[in-house]
A protein has these predicted regions:
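PG/GG-rich flexible active-site loop of Rossmann-like NAD(P)H-dependent oxidoreductases
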Residues: 82-84, 129-136
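Catalytic loop of short-chain dehydrogenase/reductase
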Residues: 29-30, 36-49, 65, 69-122
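Short-chain dehydrogenase/reductase
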Residues: 13, 60, 113, 159-162
Length: 169
């Protein structure tokens, strides 16, 4: 589905007939070139924010509007973000800057997820922000040269990490 469009999201969920107890909200988009102040494409910056930060909120809103989230205390929403949204991490790991859109989108996703957790708490819906680790994917391939140095893992390992954390919610 197109995560930037509520109708597309609703269409993706139209065959679900019962409320769900687990939602794994994993949206990502990373513009390919290294983004610097001199080279950034503002349309791409906004698209990353729309997909990575606003998109997951749209998914939850649509599921909630369609009455597809359990409200009996068993619903768990995992919001997959990234350490790339951490200001502290940027100071330690990559102090030279760049890649504005992706990192701003993940910082916004972190805040949106926290606000969502606060709002849905009264509905007995748990929301947790999860970072599955640095995964070897097509999206991170532009950093392939540092995968081993930075401890990047196969996406299946990242998925297992997420499932483990959900089991603890």
């Amino acid at each position: 589905c197109e995560i930037t469009d509520e109708k597309s999201i609703a269409n993706a969920f139209k065959e679900i007939t019962e409320p769900v107890d687990i939602v794994i909200n994993n949206a990502g988009y990373f513009y390919e070139p290294l983004e610097t102040l001199d080279s950034m494409n503002f349309e791409e910056e906004l698209q990353m924010i729309d997909i990575c930060a606003v998109g997951p909120l749209r998914v939850v809103k649509v599921l909630r509007d369609m009455k597809l989230l359990k409200t009996d205390g068993t619903c768990k929403i995992a919001m997959i973000t990234s350490q790339g949204g951490s200001i502290s991490w940027r100071e330690v790991q990559n102090p030279d800057g760049h890649d504005y859109g992706h990192h701003m989108s993940k910082a916004a996703a972190n805040m949106g997820s926290k606000l969502l957790a606060q709002e849905l708490k009264k509905e007995k819906i748990a929301v947790q922000i999860l970072h599955p680790g640095f995964n070897k994917t097509g999206m991170t391939q532009k950093y392939e040269k540092i995968w081993e140095i930075e401890g990047a893992v196969d996406a299946s390992v990242g998925a297992k990490r997420v499932m483990h954390e959900i089991s603890l919610m």
